[in-house]
Amino acid sequence: MLSNLFVIYLLFILIPNVLNLGFGSYEITKKGSIGWFYTANEVGAIISILMPFYLNEIINKKNKPIIFLSIIIIFYTLTTMGTKGPLLSFGIILIYYFIKYYKKIIKEKKYKTLGIMTTSFIIVILALMMIIPKTTFYKNIIIHLDFLKVEKISDFKNPKIIDHFIFSQRLTFLNNTVKIYNKSPISSKLLGVGYIDNYGTDQVSMKMIEMDYFDILFRQGIIGIVIIFGGIVMTINKKKRTKKINDVYLLSLFLSIILALLTGHVITSPSVSIYVALIIDLIYNGNIKEIENDKTRVCNC
């Protein structure tokens, strides 16, 4: 089920992009297309969260041509989007499976397979070094660096450059929101300051930090963050007491947690959080057989 959803989302990005019918990922300056979707952050997060289930399924089939072709199509689609989140998730997933198989091969002393795998890994890295500079993703990095007038590595010693380039000014918005939160009464600290800053003035702002943990803490208060994240903490504790849950679910949840911090629009966006909630429910209640019956196989290697 979840792997099929991933394919649907991917096709609704890939096909419009190939036909040049997709919507732009950015309004100005940067390039990229998100197909027939509306916002890059949300669809990027959905793709990232569902990706482990699809990759897990094709790797489990052990059909090398299908694995190779799928990875190429996914990589191409993600680079045409021009955003960082999905590519970061893609890299984390591949590294996870590489390490997993690497440890298995060493344990089984299959040194010939180990040599082939290592050689293939080196070839892939070299190929990526040649391909990535030609992608939309890389061009966006250059556009961003030119905008910031970054000419050498030492320029990144400037915290403002780091904030703008890596966090897209999220740290600046975080600092501004902290000031508002600190000035608020106890009731606002408990229940949140809401989603409108400077209400009733000429400087009204609805700009969020886009780092979900901080947005929830400041906008919905201490009570809000305890209620929302209490379920995730319970899920992690449940995992410690059982070995029935496959790692692919935890990998997807891990990506959700990382993206919620780095890019936002995961827990605070209903279109994304519905998938996070589904995965948490499957982990917490152990309803793995329901997914297996929908032909989403788990990797038992």
Region locations from a protein language model:
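Alpha-helical transmembrane segments of multi-pass inner-membrane proteins
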Residues: L2-S25, Y38-K103
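Membrane-embedded alpha-helical segments of multi-pass membrane proteins
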Residues: N41-M51, L88-I92, I223-G230, S271-I279
